[in-house]
């Protein structure tokens, strides 16, 4: 009995009976690893395919906006013999084909939304749009023009309010030059530096004030008692514009116009936040009362770029 047990132990300790590595192919030595065979236990990280985005570089390429400027007047056929629906379909078809060729991943509606967002936020595209206005009007920006722009910026706000409409066009040009300097300084955080939208915003706000029978001069001349104004501002901080009467709104707008031109360094943080809240409320109020100025009644989801149209009107188009 003991001899049989000893023979079993000797057989188990034999080198030929040692279990082999299951990952090594049959008939191969486990100490020799073939470099061409992948390790089945290794974890390989799957590389993520880079996502293609619609950027300013793609919009400014040969197939982007320069293609539209070069070929739109050739491809778009507007005939007086056709009705407005057919002419509009011809225009939309051109832009649909162009959008699919430039960025086929997005649908046309999504493409238009992306273009609108990138065009307003990307500094390179903003400078490109300004250069289009500049070339269309034949403006030249030399050193003398920039110096003139700096001198105009040093003028007091009272002088700027009394500038006539004929003298406003050089100011617009100098503000574009200021935008160009801001691009070189890489300061894109303040969207109010974009005079295209700033001028159009003031224009739209002026039209709403005319409808109410009040202009900015009346608002600036309103001098309420300081106690009433402080109480009104405190009420606005707590509950916002809810329940405000028309004369109270005028007082708030007058206070906003007086403090909007002040430097932020001379104001408290609470006043800066209050100005931002008032500007946001004012913009929403103007948008709500100004929908009938849209060119397309009912409008689609994008609406019309009214800011750009107002800027073109300001520049004399």
UniProtKB/Swiss-Prot annotation:
Superkingdom per UniProt: Eukaryota
Cellular localisation: Nucleus
GO biological process: DNA repair; DNA replication checkpoint signaling; establishment of mitotic sister chromatid cohesion; maintenance of DNA repeat elements; meiotic chromosome segregation; mitotic sister chromatid cohesion; replication fork arrest; replication fork processing
Pfam families with a match to the protein in the record: Swi3
UniProtKB keywords: Cell cycle, DNA damage, DNA repair, DNA replication inhibitor, Meiosis, Nucleus
Keyword Protein biosynthesis: no
Molecular function via GO: DNA binding
One Gene Ontology CC term in the entry: nucleus
Region feature Disordered, mapped onto this chain: 16-35
Assembly notes: Component of the fork protection complex (FPC) consisting of TOF1 and CSM3.
Known role: Forms a fork protection complex (FPC) with TOF1 which is required for chromosome segregation during meiosis and DNA damage repair. FPC coordinates leading and lagging strand synthesis and moves with the replication fork. FPC stabilizes replication forks in a configuration that is recognized by replication checkpoint sensors and protects stalled replication forks against the fork-releasing activity of RRM3 helicase.
PANTHER family: TIMELESS INTERACTING-RELATED (PTHR13220), TIMELESS-INTERACTING PROTEIN (PTHR13220:SF11)
Family, per entry: Belongs to the CSM3 family.
Note: Present with 358 molecules/cell in log phase SD medium.
Protein name: Chromosome segregation in meiosis protein 3
Source species of the chain: Saccharomyces cerevisiae (strain ATCC 204508 / S288c) (Baker's yeast)
